[in-house]
């Protein structure tokens, strides 16, 4: 049988589909999520239901967001899951999680085996809804999880790290080998838990400033701050904040990036003509 066919469904490469089939890993993920009746649980990309079924067994109802119309149709007619599911056949990148949380009257518990080809932009989409989310559990490419949990000074530390750790407490849960999937991906995977802060430890006054600074600093990560952010902060301003201008983007802590963002918000740059 073609290695891309699983349970009669042909894995669509353009959707980044790899289906989880390792029962030990499935049980470990479900136990980590620990779904409870009465909670507003949302799965992104349920696929063939490897996680949907065991999670759904513990719930009276749940919401799924599935782009693939064939998979959405399969879930709709699932013998015991079907009646429990509210299915949105759409791209999670366009899904309004705040509207769903408002409808449910409580913050959402979101989980999923995310398609690796869109995992990073999808994480940024979800960060814009953290006020509507209680927690998130995701299977991701191990390299992405390493970036989420990285500390300053490591090669994995980047813009995704800073933004994720600004919004959430990030906790690695378990590693998942390629053979746990059909078809087996060429990379290792891992599960991560993200718990949005009720109040960020280092609040910023305008998130757009933090987004801009991290984009520009890590866009030139081999340059020193004097060069990558020199158009925004003078050496003297950096010194006032006890930030060494000879350091690179990967050496600056989340707290320091937040400090820079608040300074920039308080000292708006003149508009260019």
From Swiss-Prot:
This protein's UniProt keywords: Cytoplasm, Methyltransferase, RNA-binding, rRNA processing, S-adenosyl-L-methionine, Transferase
Record field: catalytic activity: adenosine(1518)/adenosine(1519) in 16S rRNA + 4 S-adenosyl-L-methionine = N(6)-dimethyladenosine(1518)/N(6)-dimethyladenosine(1519) in 16S rRNA + 4 S-adenosyl-L-homocysteine + 4 H(+)
Single annotated GO MF: 16S rRNA (adenine(1518)-N(6)/adenine(1519)-N(6))-dimethyltransferase activity
Cross-referenced InterPro entries: KsgA/Erm, rRNA_Ade_diMease-like_C, rRNA_Ade_Mease_Trfase_CS, rRNA_Ade_methylase_Trfase_N, rRNA_adenine_dimethylase, SAM-dependent_MTases_sf
PROSITE patterns linked: RRNA_A_DIMETH (PS01131), SAM_RNA_A_N6_MT (PS51689)
Keyword Iron: no
EC class (word): transferase
Binding site for S-adenosyl-L-methionine: 18, 20, 45, 66, 91, 113
UniProt-annotated location(s): Cytoplasm
Cellular component aspect of the GO annotation: cytosol
EC number: 2.1.1.182
Entries under HAMAP family matching the protein: 16SrRNA_methyltr_A
Function: Specifically dimethylates two adjacent adenosines (A1518 and A1519) in the loop of a conserved hairpin near the 3'-end of 16S rRNA in the 30S particle. May play a critical role in biogenesis of 30S subunits.
Family recorded in the similarity comment: Belongs to the class I-like SAM-binding methyltransferase superfamily. rRNA adenine N(6)-methyltransferase family. RsmA subfamily.
Protein name per UniProt: Ribosomal RNA small subunit methyltransferase A
Source species: Erwinia tasmaniensis (strain DSM 17950 / CFBP 7177 / CIP 109463 / NCPPB 4357 / Et1/99)
Gene: rsmA
């Amino acid at each position: 049988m073609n290695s891309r066919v699983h349970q009669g469904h042909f894995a669509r490469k353009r959707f980044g589909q790899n289906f989880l089939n390792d029962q030990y890993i499935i049980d470990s993920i479900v136990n980590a999520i620990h779904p409870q009746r009465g909670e507003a649980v949302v799965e992104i990309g349920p696929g063939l239901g490897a996680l949907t079924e065991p999670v759904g067994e513990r719930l009276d109802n749940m919401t799924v967001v599935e782009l693939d119309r064939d998979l959405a149709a399969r879930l709709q007619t699932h013998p015991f899951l079907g009646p429990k599911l509210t299915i949105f056949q759409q791209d999670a990148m366009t899904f309004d999680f705040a509207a769903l949380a408002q409808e449910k009257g409580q913050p959402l518990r979101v989980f999923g085996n995310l398609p690796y080809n869109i995992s990073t932009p999808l994480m940024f989409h979800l960060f814009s809804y953290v006020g509507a989310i209680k927690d998130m559990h995701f299977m991701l490419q191990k390299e992405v999880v390493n970036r989420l949990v990285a500390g300053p000074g490591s090669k994995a530390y980047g813009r995704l790290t800073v933004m994720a750790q600004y919004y959430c407490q990030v906790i690695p849960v378990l590693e998942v080998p390629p053979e746990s999937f059909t078809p087996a991906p060429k990379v290792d995977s891992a599960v991560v838990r993200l718990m949005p802060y009720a109040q960020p430890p280092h609040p910023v006054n305008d998130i757009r400033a933090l987004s801009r600074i991290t984009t520009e600093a890590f866009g030139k990560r081999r340059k020193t701050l004097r060069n990558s952010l020199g158009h925004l902060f003078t050496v003297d301003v950096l010194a006032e904040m006890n930030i060494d201008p000879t350091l690179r983007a990967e050496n600056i802590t989340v707290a320091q990036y937040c400090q820079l963002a608040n300074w920039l918000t308080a000292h708006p740059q003149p508009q260019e003509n």
